[in-house]
Amino acid sequence: MPRIFVPVPSEALWYVGSIMEAGAEPMVLGLPMDLPIGGVALRREWVADWAEVFCSSNELDALLLSAAEPAELAGLLIAALRLDLPAVVVPTEDPFSVALAALGFAPLLGDAAEIAVELARTGRPRPSELVEGFSLANALRAGLASGAGPELLVHLAAIAREAGVVGFPQMIRVLAPESPEVAGSSPFEANGAAGLVAHLGDALHDTLTVTGRLKGNLPSPVPAPQAAGPRLVFVRGRASGTEIVCRGDEGVTEISGDCHFCSSEEAAVRAVESGAVGTSNLLVVVGCGPRGGPGLFRLDRLGGALREADLNIPVLTDGLAPENAVGAWASLATPEATMGGVVGRLRDGDALRLDLTEGLVRTGAKADEIRSREPFPLPASSGLGYAARYAHATLPALEGAGFG
């Protein structure tokens, strides 16, 4: 009897009965609750290692995957890649699930449990057959069209690296600016995730999925989206090698302001709540990157504080913008502050302009002055455990922010 891995708590638990009815044995195990303190990439790596150990010691035939957070789901998928065990992702309506549908793992048609049991019996397709350059391009475009933010780039880069796909960071830089969020939900309302993927049209590659070829699972025709929404734009500092991912609404040409520098998310939240940040400020928040977090912090608390204060100001960080971020966010600043990046040498009052049209970083401070400033200090030791090992070995965000 085939054995199917089912993680809990997740929506996969609802499919246990269907797995048994299809003639397979569900192997239910709870996701780790005691995660190391850190950001989304650190949690992803922890879940990947945990799932790999469990699955490799339990003679499983396939995996039925679901999780509450994209980081956890990406970790489970990375474990499937390491073991090359057939995997099916339970489809949901969130942007990361739409990306995984375009990648080939979340079925656009059929019952996820029945598909997982069929894959367990046949052994195909395996994750190594699904993850390749064209399917990753599909996933990137579909995820961004459905409203995903920069976190999608990080997890897809980690999946690409695990699969041995070369050149994905360069693909991100080319395709992301060409892939705006769909403004208006007509494709999704008409046909769900399949409609949203189908609206990509000729940009979509007909890649292999858990239910056959991708285009064979799509409706045709689909309603055209109403308009182009926000998109991701890369800006760079030529001399410093700085690179920043900006979220730009249609028609916005720059992100600018006088810097208010904060050395952590906690400091930034305090500054917002105390009224120390004004409407002319650009809030700079550092120490949140892969090494500084450690693990790449998503600034959800700061996003909440800004909403509570009804303060619509731009934010620049070496971490991640919060989910459903509104306004101008510039994130994943690389090199991060703890790696000597320019973002860690900015100071209160510096005039900063991120030119979204030219793709350039412009500052009122001279380059020599910035270089002469004290760099952002290395974080205090994260101890001797998993987080410390991660902080020592982590890769940059657009390379997946995994272990190097």
Which residues fall in each region the model found?
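Short, well-structured alpha-helical segments in soluble
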Residues: 46-58
